[in-house]
Curated annotation (Swiss-Prot):
Its cofactor is Zn(2+); Mn(2+). It comes from Saccharomyces cerevisiae (strain ATCC 204508 / S288c) (Baker's yeast). GO terms for cellular component: cytoplasm; mitochondrion. InterPro entries: CNDP/DUG1 (IPR017153), Cyt/Met_Dipeptidase (IPR051458), Peptidase_M20 (IPR002933), Peptidase_M20_dimer (IPR011650). This is Cys-Gly metallodipeptidase DUG1. The active site is at residues 104, 171. Its EC number is 3.4.13.-. The gene is DUG1.
Amino acid sequence: MSHSLTSVFQKIDSLKPQFFSRLTKAIQIPAVSSDESLRSKVFDKAKFISEQLSQSGFHDIKMVDLGIQPPPISTPNLSLPPVILSRFGSDPSKKTVLVYGHYDVQPAQLEDGWDTEPFKLVIDEAKGIMKGRGVTDDTGPLLSWINVVDAFKASGQEFPVNLVTCFEGMEESGSLKLDELIKKEANGYFKGVDAVCISDNYWLGTKKPVLTYGLRGCNYYQTIIEGPSADLHSGIFGGVVAEPMIDLMQVLGSLVDSKGKILIDGIDEMVAPLTEKEKALYKDIEFSVEELNAATGSKTSLYDKKEDILMHRWRYPSLSIHGVEGAFSAQGAKTVIPAKVFGKFSIRTVPDMDSEKLTSLVQKHCDAKFKSLNSPNKCRTELIHDGAYWVSDPFNAQFTAAKKATKLVYGVDPDFTREGGSIPITLTFQDALNTSVLLLPMGRGDDGAHSINEKLDISNFVGGMKTMAAYLQYYSESPEN
């Protein structure tokens, strides 16, 4: 290891209390982008991050206004959270790396089943974990880029690259209007960017680090069933009116079977066929059904073989039903017939699926199923947001640098993986900036992002920051841009 990285690593270790403090302050802000009533908190978190950037010596900090959020929304003239752009360094002799992250988080409430308050960071050094909403997705990794700059400065070592940040506040709600900003700034603020690095995904399992070169996309839909003009008493009207909730259950139940097979005609034909060369890539990846069971806390896997699990997680589409808006969901018993219900579901997309064609197939299927019910209610299905799938080259300069950095920190070569989740903006960065995108995960596969008791292992937090630092150093030394 070079002397410079040794010094930086030592500072990452010694500055850990400062980094814990920064993360604690960030986690306590409930920046839930999907909750319109909490939009001011998303703005508060943007301000906090901007202040942290300024204190750490970043310059040219811009809080880019994205305007008003488009429908469907309940709050008129709802402002979108800003995108935070900033720079650290502007040396033309150095390579420029853009780092992306998001400061918004998923909804979380104690009554959802959390062991602790979700917006109060719990640091359990005895167990070696930190727990809180956003700690792994994506507040912890986002702040780590700032922490790495602090560690280089404290060590007295020269920062190896020019760093550009692009931190958004709507990733959990479709990254609205970020595409347009990136395309607009491709020859502006982002001009000269040599590589893009994103730390917003996870190790495949819990033991071995990975580098990720592909993601599924995500099309999110809602089916709306509308009946009576107001909610009704089931004792008076049950059995004599067509209930929207019953219709909705029929429509949602027709989308996918209990084995995960999507039942919408035409989807299978859009999926790129599996080649023998691609199939061979799965053989050497370290993963087992036991790791999947550990990550889910159950034995509910639909597949027994490693290859089948990974292919259905990475390279085949899936359909998930997420919930129903407008229906009773609190504790206790309420005998109401809801007048209007919104069934939420999404499809994870893969090469070579086309979003417009997929939406057409989904709407056609839902309309046909509803028509078969002969219900007097009204039904429509609409796309809420979509994000494209993405695949990169795992053998280019920055993947090579990241591989070397991972080996230095963790002592093993990382697995090269694709991922089942979606970061819609990856493809936009790749195409608009005409550059490579690397996914450099910090957290483990059992972190529980989007779930209760979201956590990040302290060893991954510290090791992740060291990997980020070494990646930037090694990439700066690579012979090609």
